[in-house]
A protein has these predicted regions:
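Juxtamembrane intracellular "pre-TM" segments in multi-pass secondary transporters
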Residues: 1-8, 193-230
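Pair of pore-lining "gating" transmembrane helices in MFS-fold secondary transporters
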Residues: 4-37, 108, 221-242
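Hydrophobic core of transmembrane alpha-helices in multi-pass small-molecule transporters
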Residues: 19, 100-115
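Short amphipathic helix-loop junctions that connect adjacent transmembrane helices
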Residues: 31-43, 245-264
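Helix-to-loop junctions at the C-terminal end of transmembrane segments
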Residues: 60-73, 159, 274-288
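C-terminal ends and interior cores of transmembrane alpha-helices
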Residues: 82-97, 298
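Glycine-rich segments within core transmembrane alpha-helices of 12-TM secondary carriers
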Residues: 135-155
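C-terminal membrane-cytosol helix-exit motif in multi-pass small-molecule transporters
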Residues: 151, 155-160, 178-203
Length: 298
């Protein structure tokens, strides 16, 4: 298969998986904070769910990267999405039994699906040309927009589904998450063939160096652009996640329905991702650093 055709197939497959994982992960953000608040009877602790999920994504990012180096993107992404699906089951059990340990273990493992979703974006550029690299990555990000906007709007029907199984309404989004992340695993396992990472590594004149976590961190410390990128992500996420996590709690405090809470989170997520193709095109045209600077200012 020519690389151009393989690249188009790869992007379509990754975008499809991102739609499914987006539905699952985004739908659990509001539900997770509300569940933790309900279990602990404390609004102050509501942020623990998202904190646990973010820690899970961070902790599992490098292990998934090592899996990629050993066996390719298909292996790493499949493991990440599968771990997320299992985590959703733990969160369901934690919510049903009012067990905060199981709940936070579940949200931690759902973080693996987030880590896989982030790595799926970079899988889109394994075979991309320098001229279209950011644009192709942004299409996969945009694919997650569909799922991420849809997921929070399923809170009400997901709650109804949970009640039909005799479960608390707030675990409903985790039922959806378990199903959609399992489907994302199937999509990756069946259609991400041949593996873009393995193809790119085989055709590369310079073989990719396999290192450990210590070497990776040392490389980041010695790379100003990498440090700039990490700092930019950290600043953006502090503002974004703080608003995203606490808004549902405050809305629930004044008896806003799950339907409206889901709609508000969907609008927030739409703002996060909807313009990613435009940002990608601007990055190819103006440069990555300049676009990041514009984003931080705005």
């Amino acid at each position: 298969m020519p690389n151009s055709a393989l690249q188009h197939r790869t992007v379509r497959t990754l975008a499809s998986a991102q739609v499914l994982s987006g539905v699952g992960v985004a739908g659990t953000v509001a539900a997770g904070s509300l569940l933790v608040s309900s279990i602990t009877d404390s609004e102050t602790l509501a942020g623990l769910a998202q904190t646990s999920a973010v820690l899970g994504a961070a902790a599992l990012a490098l292990p998934l990267a090592r899996l990629t180096a050993r066996g390719g993107r298909r292996l790493a992404l499949s493991v990440g999405y599968t771990a997320g699906a299992i985590g959703s089951v733990f969160a369901i059990l934690g919510g049903a039994q009012s067990n905060i340990f199981l709940m936070l273990l579940g949200t931690f493992m759902v973080g693996a699906a987030s880590a896989a979703g982030y790595q799926a974006r970079f899988a889109a550029i394994d075979l991309a040309t320098d001229q279209t690299r950011a644009k192709q990555l942004s299409f996969v990000v945009w694919g997650s927009t569909i799922g991420a906007v849809t997921g929070p709007n399923l809170m009400q029907p997901a709650g109804n589904l949970a009640e039909n199984f005799g479960l608390p309404r707030l675990v409903g989004p985790y039922l959806i998450s378990a199903m959609t992340l399992a489907l994302a695993t199937i999509v990756i396992a069946m259609f991400l063939r041949p593996d873009p990472y393995l193809v790119a590594n085989k055709e590369s004149v310079t073989k990719l160096e396999k290192g450990d976590t210590k070497k990776a961190l040392k490389h980041i410390r010695n790379n100003p652009k990498a440090l700039f990128a990490i700092l930019s992500i950290a600043i953006g996420h502090v503002a974004m996640v703080s608003v995203m996590v606490m808004t549902p709690v405050h809305m629930a405090h004044v008896d806003v329905t799950l339907t409206i809470i889901g709609l508000v989170i969907s609008i927030h997520v739409l703002g996060m991702y909807a313009f990613s193709p435009v940002v990608g095109a601007l990055s190819d045209r103006l440069g990555r650093v300049r676009v990041i600077q514009i984003g931080l200012i705005t």
